[in-house]
Amino acid sequence: MRTISAQQITDTVARLCIEANTRLPRDVQEALDKARAEEPWPLAKNTLDLLWSNLAAAKEENLPICQDTGMACVFVELGTDVHIDGSFEAAIHEGVRRGYTCLLYTSRCV
Protein backbone atom coordinates (compact mmCIF):
# COMPACT_ATOMS: atom_id res chain seq x y z
CA MET A 1 0.00 0.00 0.00
CA ARG A 2 1.22 3.47 -0.88
CA THR A 3 0.56 6.38 1.48
CA ILE A 4 0.33 9.95 0.24
CA SER A 5 0.04 12.86 2.64
CA ALA A 6 -2.72 15.39 2.18
CA GLN A 7 0.02 18.04 2.23
CA GLN A 8 1.62 16.51 -0.89
CA ILE A 9 -1.73 16.68 -2.65
CA THR A 10 -2.27 20.30 -1.58
CA ASP A 11 1.20 21.33 -2.75
CA THR A 12 0.83 19.55 -6.09
CA VAL A 13 -2.62 20.97 -6.81
CA ALA A 14 -1.42 24.50 -5.95
CA ARG A 15 1.59 24.14 -8.25
CA LEU A 16 -0.55 22.80 -11.09
CA CYS A 17 -3.08 25.62 -10.73
CA ILE A 18 -0.28 28.14 -11.05
CA GLU A 19 1.26 26.34 -14.04
CA ALA A 20 -2.09 26.03 -15.81
CA ASN A 21 -2.63 29.79 -15.53
CA THR A 22 0.88 31.01 -16.31
CA ARG A 23 2.05 28.66 -19.07
CA LEU A 24 0.66 27.37 -22.34
CA PRO A 25 1.03 23.76 -23.42
CA ARG A 26 3.97 23.32 -25.81
CA ASP A 27 1.77 22.50 -28.82
CA VAL A 28 -0.28 25.68 -28.34
CA GLN A 29 2.84 27.82 -28.01
CA GLU A 30 4.31 26.20 -31.14
CA ALA A 31 1.08 26.93 -33.04
CA LEU A 32 1.25 30.58 -31.92
CA ASP A 33 4.90 30.82 -33.00
CA LYS A 34 4.02 29.32 -36.38
CA ALA A 35 1.10 31.72 -36.84
CA ARG A 36 3.35 34.69 -35.98
CA ALA A 37 5.97 33.58 -38.50
CA GLU A 38 3.46 32.98 -41.29
CA GLU A 39 1.02 35.87 -40.77
CA PRO A 40 1.23 38.25 -43.76
CA TRP A 41 -1.15 40.95 -42.50
CA PRO A 42 0.70 43.51 -40.29
CA LEU A 43 -2.22 44.23 -37.96
CA ALA A 44 -2.83 40.54 -37.30
CA LYS A 45 0.91 39.94 -36.85
CA ASN A 46 1.02 42.79 -34.34
CA THR A 47 -1.84 41.18 -32.40
CA LEU A 48 -0.02 37.84 -32.37
CA ASP A 49 3.15 39.63 -31.22
CA LEU A 50 1.19 41.19 -28.34
CA LEU A 51 -0.15 37.78 -27.34
CA TRP A 52 3.37 36.35 -27.44
CA SER A 53 4.71 39.24 -25.30
CA ASN A 54 1.92 38.68 -22.79
CA LEU A 55 2.75 34.97 -22.59
CA ALA A 56 6.44 35.69 -22.08
CA ALA A 57 5.68 38.20 -19.31
CA ALA A 58 3.28 35.78 -17.62
CA LYS A 59 5.91 33.05 -17.62
CA GLU A 60 8.74 35.31 -16.40
CA GLU A 61 6.72 37.06 -13.69
CA ASN A 62 4.57 34.06 -12.70
CA LEU A 63 1.42 36.02 -13.55
CA PRO A 64 -1.78 34.72 -15.11
CA ILE A 65 -1.85 34.67 -18.90
CA CYS A 66 -5.35 36.12 -18.73
CA GLN A 67 -7.04 38.14 -16.00
CA ASP A 68 -9.99 35.73 -16.09
CA THR A 69 -8.40 32.52 -14.86
CA GLY A 70 -11.67 30.63 -14.99
CA MET A 71 -12.84 28.06 -12.48
CA ALA A 72 -10.74 25.06 -11.51
CA CYS A 73 -12.07 21.60 -12.20
CA VAL A 74 -9.81 18.90 -10.77
CA PHE A 75 -9.87 15.39 -12.23
CA VAL A 76 -8.11 12.69 -10.21
CA GLU A 77 -7.14 9.13 -11.03
CA LEU A 78 -6.47 7.24 -7.83
CA GLY A 79 -5.44 3.61 -7.59
CA THR A 80 -7.10 1.13 -5.26
CA ASP A 81 -4.00 0.48 -3.17
CA VAL A 82 -3.44 4.10 -2.07
CA HIS A 83 -4.02 5.57 1.37
CA ILE A 84 -4.39 9.34 1.81
CA ASP A 85 -3.07 10.58 5.13
CA GLY A 86 -5.66 13.29 5.78
CA SER A 87 -8.73 14.55 3.96
CA PHE A 88 -8.40 14.05 0.21
CA GLU A 89 -11.15 16.51 -0.73
CA ALA A 90 -9.95 19.16 1.72
CA ALA A 91 -6.40 18.82 0.35
CA ILE A 92 -7.61 19.47 -3.20
CA HIS A 93 -9.72 22.46 -2.14
CA GLU A 94 -6.80 23.92 -0.19
CA GLY A 95 -4.45 23.42 -3.15
CA VAL A 96 -6.83 25.27 -5.47
CA ARG A 97 -7.28 28.04 -2.90
CA ARG A 98 -3.52 28.46 -2.51
CA GLY A 99 -2.82 28.27 -6.21
CA TYR A 100 -5.35 30.95 -7.01
CA THR A 101 -4.68 33.29 -4.08
CA CYS A 102 -0.91 33.17 -3.55
CA LEU A 103 -0.36 35.15 -6.74
CA LEU A 104 -3.38 37.40 -6.27
CA TYR A 105 -5.50 35.60 -8.83
CA THR A 106 -9.19 36.35 -9.03
CA SER A 107 -11.06 35.01 -6.02
CA ARG A 108 -14.51 34.72 -7.58
CA CYS A 109 -14.48 30.93 -7.43
CA VAL A 110 -11.98 30.24 -4.62
Identify what each model region corresponds to:
Residues 105-110:
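Conserved small/polar residues in nucleotide/adenosyl-binding loops
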Residues 66-67, 100-104:
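Hydrophobic transmembrane alpha-helix bundles
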Residues 1-60, 76-91, 96-101:
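Charge-biased, low-complexity intrinsically disordered regions
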Residues 61-76:
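Conserved phosphate/anionic-ligand binding catalytic regions in large, soluble enzymes, centered on
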